[in-house]
Amino acid sequence: MARNLDPKCRQCRREGEKLFLKGEKCFTDKCAIERRAYAPGQHGQKSGARLSGYGVQLREKQKIRRIYGVLEGQFRLTYKRADSRKGVTGENLLSMLESRLDSVCYRMGFGASRTEARQIVRHNGIVVNGRRVNIPSYQVRPGDVVEVAEKSKAQLRIKAAADATATRGYPEWIEVDAKALKGTYKAHPQRSELPSTINESLVVELYSK
C-alpha cells in the first residue's frame, strides 16, 4: 500500500509548525521544530520567498494531508464526498477526516500518533461496535463504541499511548475509559473544537478552480 515515506520531522519543518506526527516526541524539547524552526534542505534557513495565492492554497492542502496521513487520491475523494454533503464543505472535510477510524483511535489514545493508530487498525487491533474493523479510512459515526481488541490490550505501546493521552485530556466529542481501552464517539467535532491553525477554506478555493 502506498504511503508517505518522508521523515516525519522533515514534514513538520517543511510546514513550519508542529503536525504532531511523532507521538510523544512532539511534546518534548526534542521536537525538530523546537531545535530547527526552518525549512529542511541546503537553503532552508534562507527560504523566505513569498508564495503565490495558488502556492499558499497548495501548501495548506499538503499540511492537512500530512496531519491526517492521507494520500492525494484519498484526500480528493474525501473532498468530493464532503462537497456533496449539506453544510459548509471545508467543515465537512475536516469532520470526515476526524471521523476516520485511525484518527478516532489516535484521539482516544490507542496510538501515540495517527501513523501508529493506523498500524494498530490494520493489524486487526481495533473493534467497532463489537466487530473487528481493519480499514483505517472507515467512517466512525456518532454513538459508535471503539475499543482495543482483547488480543492487543497487552501491547506496551498502546498502554503507553493511552496513559499519555489520558494525562493530556480528550476532545469534547469523545468519551474514553482509559483503563478499559474503550471509548465512544459521541458526535462529530464542531469547527471551534478543531485547531485554528488549519485553514480549510484554502483547500476549498484550490479545488473549486
From Swiss-Prot:
Keyword Manganese: no
GO molecular function, one term: structural constituent of ribosome
Alphabetical list of InterPro entries matching this protein: Ribosomal_uS4, Ribosomal_uS4_bac-type, Ribosomal_uS4_CS, Ribosomal_uS4_N, S4_RNA-bd, S4_RNA-bd_sf
Span of domain S4 RNA-binding: 99-159
One of the record's GO cellular component terms: small ribosomal subunit
GO BP, sorted A to Z: ribosomal small subunit biogenesis; translation
Superkingdom, natural source: Bacteria
Keyword tags: Ribonucleoprotein, Ribosomal protein, RNA-binding, rRNA-binding
Family as reported in the entry's similarity comment: Belongs to the universal ribosomal protein uS4 family.
Quaternary structure annotation from Swiss-Prot or TrEMBL: Part of the 30S ribosomal subunit. Contacts protein S5. The interaction surface between S4 and S5 is involved in control of translational fidelity.
Function: One of the primary rRNA binding proteins, it binds directly to 16S rRNA where it nucleates assembly of the body of the 30S subunit.
Protein name: Small ribosomal subunit protein uS4
UniProt organism field: Thiobacillus denitrificans (strain ATCC 25259 / T1)
Gene: rpsD
